[in-house]
Amino acid sequence: MWIGIISLFPEMFRAITDYGVTGRAVKNGLLSIQSWSPRDFTHDRHRTVDDRPYGGGPGMLMMVQPLRDAIHAAKAAAGEGAKVIYLSPQGRKLDQAGVSELATNQKLILVCGRYEGIDERVIQTEIDEEWSIGDYVLSGGELPAMTLIDSVSRFIPGVLGHEASATEDSFAEGLLDCPHYTRPEVLEGMEVPPVLLSGNHAEIRRWRLKQSLGRTWLRRPELLENLALTEEQARLLAEFKKEHAQQQHKHDGMA
């Protein structure tokens, strides 16, 4: 996968290119990241990249000409088929389904805004899609862009150490992840669930699915509203609810 970055602070993306899963992907040639700074496309000695908004008000906007020229340079480098994305609070909210959808693109250009944003006409003429990582304000689009790159890169074949890792991530099936355990077997009196030590892979799969369903029901119940549960999933969720109610009753009785 090839990803182009339009940013006033391209050095921030060393967190992606030099470390962790994405750093290994870059090193192994599975992910290529290039960056363009609008500051390199300015024509004044101060390398100005911001301008006042029409209509007044606080803050500045990114200057149109350097930004457009940077986008055009990235498009030229990408060639045919690159999708241009603007990271914006007004965009479609990123979720696992959206990540999976974006991962089908071989070329992405990510435009990172700064100040109060960018000229609406640049969005209309240069941007294919707007994406947001949440309903809150950040100082720029770099962190959202890094979030998008990290999540999308997990779908690139060969990036993760285990082929099933991406499909078993939280939200991959619309559910939260199940609890995980490693050594020691007993930690301050808390034991690993016996089923995980049993070696019975069918029972382990069933336990993990039940816990995943139950955790989603407890913490993010709205996610279940959008799912058509299978017969097995519905049965396991009912079991979890019954066991949870029994535990709550036992806890209340001890209180």
Curated annotation (Swiss-Prot):
Record-level Gene Ontology MF annotations? tRNA (guanine(37)-N1)-methyltransferase activity
Which InterPro entries does this one have? Alpha/beta_knot_MTases (IPR029028), tRNA_m1G_MeTrfase_C_sf (IPR023148), tRNA_m1G_MeTrfase_TrmD (IPR002649), tRNA_m1G_MTases_N (IPR029026), tRNA_MeTrfase_TRMD/TRM10 (IPR016009)
Q: What is its EC number?
A: 2.1.1.228
UniProt keyword annotations, A-Z: Cytoplasm, Methyltransferase, S-adenosyl-L-methionine, Transferase, tRNA processing
Superkingdom classification of source = Bacteria
Location in the cell reads: Cytoplasm
> What GO biological process, any one, is recorded here?
tRNA N1-guanine methylation
The kind of enzyme this is, by top-level EC class, is transferase
The principal localisation class reads cytoplasm
Cite a GO CC annotation. cytosol
Q: Which family does it belong to?
A: Belongs to the RNA methyltransferase TrmD family.
Instruction: Relate the protein's function as given in its record.
Output: Specifically methylates guanosine-37 in various tRNAs.
Q: What's the protein called, per UniProt?
A: tRNA (guanine-N(1)-)-methyltransferase
Gene this protein is translated from: trmD
